[in-house]
Amino acid sequence: IGDLQVPDSNGVRLPKGFASRIVARSGHDYFGYHWHAAPDGGATFATDDDGWIYVSNNELNKSNGGAGSLRFDKDGELIDAYSILKNTSRNCAGGHTPWGTWLSCEEIDEGQVWECDPYGKKDPVLRATLGRFNHEAVAVDTSTMQLYLTEDKRDGCLYRYTSNSIDELSGYPDLDNGFLEVAEIIKGEIGALHWHLLPDPQAKDTPTRKQVSQSSSFNRGEGIWFHEDAIFFTTTGNNRVYAYDIKNNDLSIIY
């Protein structure tokens, strides 16, 4: 792509040939939607008219959070804006699913994950089986349909969700019927992982990160992504980028 150039008029450094523009401002109205404050994690979704939808989380606390969508036509013009999730708290990051939904994660101690329709046509659905903890982000392994989740705590953990059933027609997992596991690095800071079944994903008495004594801590887990049979995730507390080779069960630090 090329080296980053000096900051443009918006303060954004981009490669040569790229340009930035502001498409929405917090507190302004667009097509009847009051664009939310504290925009955070987001993703884009292609539409059948060759345009796209940009989904953005709202990280306000105390049930003032949620998520909203901006819809663009094929020429990049904004043609609609609307809410897709309301009355949640500190929706930080999340994840784009292969089946075209947005998983919005609450970054609070009792946080949960909400599955949202980018088009705003369907009501958001609470996916309680993904656990209650200080959620940050989630990525889907498109080979196994397992979900990997990060936790934004200094002693946070890495989690994996496995569905008990995969739809025969779509090939997609049931997010209401499955189990959650937590990772243990067997020796040292890298290498093979062991996945322990989480006793109580709803954390009724004990936080999930403290339920399994062998679980390994990651210093403020952040963004996570699946690419070519590997899970990549970052940690803010020590500025690391991890890569988990799923097939070979090997965790490494690449930055």
Where are these regions (language model features)?
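Sequence/structural signature of beta-propeller domains
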Residues: 1-255
